[in-house]
């Protein structure tokens, strides 16, 4: 059994017991969140178009740093900037 979950403008395949890195959620560590499921595939192969996924927030963290480099030739113009995108690690508990 699995579900396709949409959160933060992206879609993820959620299965019970699986850890997912999603865009940062406004929930504290240890809290339970409900995410809307776009479609749910049951064990018998049946496909449902609605459902919910209950998940627990494990931790909040940031991804590895990416570097953004701007450069203009012949003008001695260079800029280096770094960015770390925040994410939330959740554990899927059940699909309803």
From Swiss-Prot:
This protein binds to 23S rRNA in the presence of protein L20. GO terms for cellular component: cytoplasm; ribonucleoprotein complex; ribosome. One of its GO terms (molecular function) is structural constituent of ribosome. InterPro entries: bL21-like, bL21-like_sf, Ribosomal_bL21, Ribosomal_bL21_CS. The keyword Aminoacyl-tRNA synthetase does not apply. Keywords: Ribonucleoprotein, Ribosomal protein, RNA-binding, rRNA-binding. Disulfide bonds: none annotated. Part of the 50S ribosomal subunit. Contacts protein L20. GO terms for biological process: translation. The keyword rRNA-binding applies. Belongs to the bacterial ribosomal protein bL21 family. This is Large ribosomal subunit protein bL21.
């Amino acid at each position: 059994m699995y579900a396709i979950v949409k959160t933060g403008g992206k879609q993820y395949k959620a299965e019970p017991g699986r850890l997912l890195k999603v865009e940062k959620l406004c929930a504290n560590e240890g809290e339970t969140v409900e995410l809307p499921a776009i479609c749910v595939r049951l064990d018998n192969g049946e496909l449902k178009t609605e459902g919910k996924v209950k998940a627990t927030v494990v931790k909040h963290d940031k991804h590895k740093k990416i570097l953004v480099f701007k450069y203009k030739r012949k003008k001695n113009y260079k800029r280096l900037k770094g960015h770390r995108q925040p994410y939330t690690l959740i554990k899927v508990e059940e699909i309803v």
